[in-house]
Structure formats: structure tokens, C-alpha cells
């Protein structure tokens, strides 16, 4: 089994290396690819040093079985044919192919079997906020069909990249030192602030990030569920959180929800508010599971349930989800 990582020097690329090593992914060889800026860098994996190769239009993927790509939508579109033409499975972390009808959009806890049918040889990894939410929604959907979802996301600085996280830390330092605040990676100062905008605004008034949650949730869950999101950038460093309201066909009790979520794969129940136990980014950063708590009946809707979740958007929201897809393909004998 030969594995490639495209975008190996980025935050998600580095997380791929950690996740693959931690999970003892069954592979015989590894090749790393990057831009001119990162080509030549060296990284250690399982005690062996690997040098990043320059990504080019050639036959470098001829012997690759699985390629994890995380270098942006433009690169994914440009190199998709080079990556897949000899039979490699491309598991793409960008937005390039998520809504392509010939590309499955997969969260293994929800729709792993969709990964087995991939006409273009590509499997898309959903947006991080979508992944985190549907992992929690799936066990509730099995109790009663979800008709409507309202989400407010609270997304950390690192969701905008490593440079954005560094800028937030710099902003705090500049404020303390009485210096002018540097604002380059965000629309406004993020330190001591929240920004109700992630990505660009669309004609309907929603942002691109918010529309991703609408479209991707429906595709993953094979559902016509109505879904409305408000995505907000907050001044935590790593791990996203979401406040979620759902309306189901029949009422789901708090006890039913807790029991289903406690048994669900990829979910950790942290729901004891009387003792100040609930999910927070400080505890979920670096963890694989999505943590859920504050589960309660919606007092405005007898068929409503509301809860709070938090998870590491770089792990389950990106690298881990992609690796789990690959593990499912191997287990299913669906890789050459």
C-alpha cells in the first residue's frame, strides 16, 4: 500500500502524518508532495525521514494507491486527473468536488458505503463544521427523522489556517503592549471580539461557509432536511463548537438522545451541567471524538431538541475523517 499526501507541509497535511502514525495505518510506502515553497522540506514518519517532492504534472502517482489531498480547491481541480488516472483513490479535503454528483461526500459514521461508488476515483471530505454536526445528528436521525436544523457555529482562529492563529496571538500581544493591532487574516480584529462572517457573502445573505453546511448536510444524510446556519469566528485558538437545534418527526426525549449519543461511534457524551460538565474547545482540541452536551428539550417546539457540541476541526474535521474513509475502503477490499 503506497500513500501520498498532497499539501504535506500545511496544518492538515501535518495532521495526516500524525493520524496515520497513531492509527498504524497499513502502508508500505509514503510520498509527500508540496509547492515550490515547501518542496525539499523533510518530515519524520514512523522513524523514517521523507522529503517533500514538488507537485508536478507527471507520472508521480502511477504506483500510489491512496492520495490524501489538502492543498486547496484550485490544486485539487488542477491535479485530479494526474492523481487518479492510474487508479489511485483521491480523498480530497478541499471544497473542489463536494457537490459533484459523481463524487461521494463521506463521513464514515453516517454514510461510509457511499465511498464504494466513485465514478471519478475521488472521494470528498466534507467541511469541518458539517462533519462535526452530522456525526452527532446520525444517531438521532435513527430514532426519528430530522425535519429541520438550525446551527450557530463558533469557529476557532485555526480554522482560517496557521497564519490566522498566529495573527490572533499577535493581536493579543499588540493590545497588551499598546500597539496598533495587525488585521490581515480576518475581516476585523478578532482578539476580544467575535466576527459573524466566515468566507464570502452569497446573494441570499448567507456566507459560503453557511451554505456549505446546508448543501453538504443534505447530501451526506440523503435527506431533504431544512438546514439554516450562522457561522461565527471566535477568539479560541483550536477546536470548533456548535449550538444545534433540531426538529424531528416525533419527539425525542433527553434520555433517548443521551442513550443514543453515548453509544454512538465517534461521539463522547459530556452532559452533566449541574456539575459544570459540558464540552469546551479547551478539552476537545487534539481529541478524535466530537463531544456533545447541554442536551435539552426545546421549550419553543414540542418536537424540538437542542444541544451543544465541540470538536477538533483539524482532526475529525479534516485529517482523521479522511483516514477513516481510507480505512473503510481497505476493510471493504475496495482499494486496488
Where do the PLM segments sit?
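Charged docking surfaces used in two-component/phosphorelay signaling
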Residues: 67, 157-336
Amino acid at each position: 500500500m503506497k500513500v501520498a499526501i498532497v499539501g504535506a507541509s500545511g496544518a492538515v497535511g501535518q495532521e495526516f502524518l500524525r493520524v496515520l502514525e497513531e492509527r498504524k495505518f497499513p502502508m508500505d510506502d509514503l510520498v509527500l508532495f508540496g509547492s515550490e515553497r515547501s518542496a525539499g522540506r523533510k518530515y519524520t514518519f514512523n522513524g523514517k525521514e521523507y522529503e517533500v517532492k514538488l507537485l508536478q504534472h507527471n507520472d508521480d502517482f502511477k504506483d500510489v494507491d491512496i492520495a490524501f489531498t489538502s492543498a486547496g480547491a484550485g490544486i485539487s481541480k488542477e491535479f485530479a486527473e494526474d492523481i487518479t488516472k492510474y487508479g489511485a483513490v483521491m480523498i480530497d479535503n478541499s471544497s473542489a468536488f463536494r457537490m459533484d454528483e459523481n463524487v461521494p461526500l463521506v463521513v464514515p459514521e453516517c454514510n461510509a458505503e457511499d465511498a464504494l461508488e466513485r465514478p471519478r476515483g475521488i472521494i470528498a471530505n466534507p467541511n469541518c463544521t458539517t462533519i462535526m454536526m452530522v456525526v452527532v445528528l446520525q444517531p438521532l436521525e435513527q430514532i426519528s427523522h430530522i425535519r429541520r436544523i438550525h446551527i450557530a457555529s463558533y469557529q476557532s482562529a485555526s480554522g482560517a489556517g496557521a497564519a490566522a492563529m498566529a495573527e490572533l496571538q499577535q493581536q493579543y500581544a499588540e493590545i497588551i503592549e499598546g500597539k496598533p493591532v495587525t488585521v490581515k487574516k480576518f475581516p476585523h480584529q478578532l482578539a476580544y471580539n467575535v466576527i459573524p462572517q466566515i468566507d464570502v457573502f452569497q446573494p441570499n445573505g448567507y456566507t459560503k461557509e453557511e451554505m456549505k453546511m446546508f448543501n453538504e448536510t443534505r447530501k451526506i444524510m440523503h435527506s431533504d432536511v431544512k438546514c439554516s446556519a450562522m457561522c461565527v469566528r471566535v477568539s479560541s485558538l483550536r477546536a470548533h463548537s456548535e449550538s444545534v437545534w433540531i426538529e424531528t418527526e416525533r419527539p425525542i426525549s433527553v434520555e433517548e438522545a443521551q442513550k443514543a449519543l453515548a453509544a454512538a461511534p465517534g461521539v463522547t457524551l459530556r452532559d452533566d451541567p449541574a456539575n459544570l460538565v459540558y464540552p469546551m474547545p479547551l478539552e476537545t482540541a487534539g481529541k478524535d471524538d466530537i463531544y456533545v452536551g447541554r442536551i435539552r428539550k426545546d421549550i419553543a417546539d414540542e418536537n424540538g431538541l437542542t444541544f451543544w457540541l465541540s470538536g477538533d476541526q483539524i482532526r475529525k474535521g479534516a485529517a482523521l475523517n479522511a483516514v477513516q474513509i481510507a480505512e473503510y475502503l481497505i476493510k471493504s477490499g475496495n482499494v486496488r
